[in-house]
């Protein structure tokens, strides 16, 4: 069943540590990224970091008297920027999984 597999050189502890390091690096890299979305021709702008925490919000003064429009633009903008962050997380996870083939290689 395990013919051809060299179990003498297989060190699962090292592989796990390597994977954990790769995952931590990816997590730190993602957290430092900033994603920005604009709606209403730039009247609303939201920026979030890779942890999906809002780091900046800009609203044009002209929207402050139009609650319905402001709500629509905020929802649209927020959904878009969250989607950007989620797509980035998926891409980073796929890249991390692609790196599994390099386990145990020095």
Curated annotation (Swiss-Prot):
What keywords sit in the KW lines?
A: Cytoplasm, DNA-binding
Q: Does the keyword DNA-binding apply?
A: yes
Among SUPFAM superfamilies, the record links this protein to: YbaB-like (SSF82607)
Q: Which domain of life is it from?
A: Bacteria
Q: Where does it reside?
A: Cytoplasm, Nucleoid
Q: Which InterPro entries match?
A: YbaB-like_sf, YbaB/EbfC
Q: Looking at the Swiss-Prot or TrEMBL record, what is one Pfam family this protein matches?
A: YbaB_DNA_bd
Q: Which GO terms describe its cellular component?
A: bacterial nucleoid; cytosol
User: What would be an example GO MF term here?
Assistant: DNA binding
**Which family does the UniProt entry place this protein in?**
Belongs to the YbaB/EbfC family.
Q: How does it assemble?
A: Homodimer.
| PANTHER family recorded | NUCLEOID-ASSOCIATED PROTEIN YBAB
Function of the molecule:
Binds to DNA and alters its conformation. May be involved in regulation of gene expression, nucleoid organization and DNA protection.
Query: What protein name applies here?
Result: Nucleoid-associated protein Abu_0429
Annotated source species = Aliarcobacter butzleri (strain RM4018) (Arcobacter butzleri)
């Amino acid at each position: 069943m395990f013919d051809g597999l060299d179990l003498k050189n297989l060190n699962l502890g090292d592989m796990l540590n390597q994977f954990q390091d790769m995952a931590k690096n990816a997590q730190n890299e993602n957290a430092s990224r900033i994603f920005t979305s604009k709606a209403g021709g730039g009247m609303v702008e939201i920026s979030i970091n890779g942890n999906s925490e809002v780091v900046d919000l800009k609203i044009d003064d002209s929207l402050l008297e139009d609650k319905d429009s402001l709500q629509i633009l905020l929802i649209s903008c927020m959904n878009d920027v969250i989607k950007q962050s989620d797509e980035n997380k998926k891409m980073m996870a796929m890249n991390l999984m692609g790196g599994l083939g390099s386990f145990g290689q020095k």
